[in-house]
Regions:
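Membrane helix-loop-helix hairpins that form the core translocation module of multi-pass transporters
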Residues: 151-159
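Short, cationic low-complexity segments
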Residues: 169-185
Length: 304
């Protein structure tokens, strides 16, 4: 594999939540301004992350950690991802894992077959990432979708909630690196969904009150199809100063699954229709695991 010099930027589409990933050394102090530049170049971008990959450059024996320090060669981490605001992002984790496979030329040396889908054609590749805001390595499972260009089905094992509690007449799900407020139709705050300026003011105020690394407002309502929900995500990240009505929000989807499973005390599997498409979440309070499922597509690459 040839070595790439300088900075490159890849644009990926995980269920409409357009994500830019920068490869190369960018000091943490310069990441917000680099992210702002990319968002000016590609206004459809909703978030920017910075990645280092083990083995993507033949000369690279280890990858720097999310704060720019040298990582241990034997750590087992294949990708390190730091978001521009230092928050955790599930869709960016999915995107970084997909980009890693793309860079490695779909070398399936890390392949493991998911037990519930044992046939060879259903083999998934596991990628382990260190992600800003997450205390433990994040596992992503990917399977390439044939004849769809560089596109993958993906599953992310989401970090556990650190707390689920009432907030006004809503539910607050505290997570590593970001928190989410689930706003259901019966809430007196649900009207904020149709008052964008008031909603954006509220998410900033509540984020400060909660001292959160980032805060999402997840407006949740029943969809027409049975057992399906419609969700409209608004996310504020103080570290990058961004407020976005996102096309999809992976961590917000996971938070909704965690909220429902904590409420029912049993395994919950939900399909959430979001502006950019559908995400699925499976949350099991018995095992404590929450898995998010979606797709990710590589759409563009350019030099910075």
């Amino acid at each position: 594999m040839t070595s790439r010099k300088g900075l490159s930027c890849c644009i990926l589409d995980p269920t409409g939540n357009i994500t830019a990933l920068v490869e190369g050394d960018v000091p943490v102090s310069r990441q917000p301004e680099t992210a702002a530049r990319i968002m000016r170049l590609r206004p459809e971008t909703e978030q920017v992350g910075f990645v280092r990959m083990r083995g993507a450059d033949p000369a690279e024996e280890s990858v720097k950690d999310t704060e720019g320090q040298n990582g241990a060669p034997g750590s087992g981490i294949q990708v390190r991802l730091r978001m521009a605001g230092g928050e955790f992002c599930g869709n960016a984790s999915m995107s970084a894992a997909a980009l890693y496979l793309y860079r490695m030329g779909a070398d399936h040396s890390a392949k493991s077959t998911v037990t519930e889908e044992p046939s060879a054609s259903d083999a998934w590749t596991n990628v382990f990432l260190e992600v800003s805001g997450a205390e433990e390595p994040v596992e992503v499972r990917l399977r390439e979708i044939p004849a769809a260009g560089p596109t993958w089905s993906a599953r992310v094992k989401m970090p556990k909630a650190t707390g689920i509690e009432p907030f006004e007449d809503m539910t607050l799900v505290r997570m590593q690196g970001i928190s989410h407020i689930i706003i259901e139709e019966g809430s007196r705050f649900f009207h904020l969904k149709n008052d964008k300026s008031a909603a954006e003011a509220a998410v900033r105020e509540w984020c400060g009150r909660l001292s959160a690394d980032g805060l999402g407002l997840m407006f949740l309502e029943r969809a027409e199809a049975a057992q399906r929900w419609k969700m409209t995500p608004l996310v504020f990240v103080p570290g990058s100063g961004t407020v976005f009505w996102e096309n999809s929000c992976a961590s917000g989807t996971a938070a909704t699954g965690m909220c429902f499973s904590a409420r029912s005390g049993k395994r919950e599997e939900l399909a959430l229709q979001e502006p950019g498409g559908e995400l699925q979440v499976l949350s099991d309070p018995t095992t404590g695991e929450t898995w998010l499922s979606g797709t990710v597509r590589l759409t563009e690459e350019f030099a910075l």
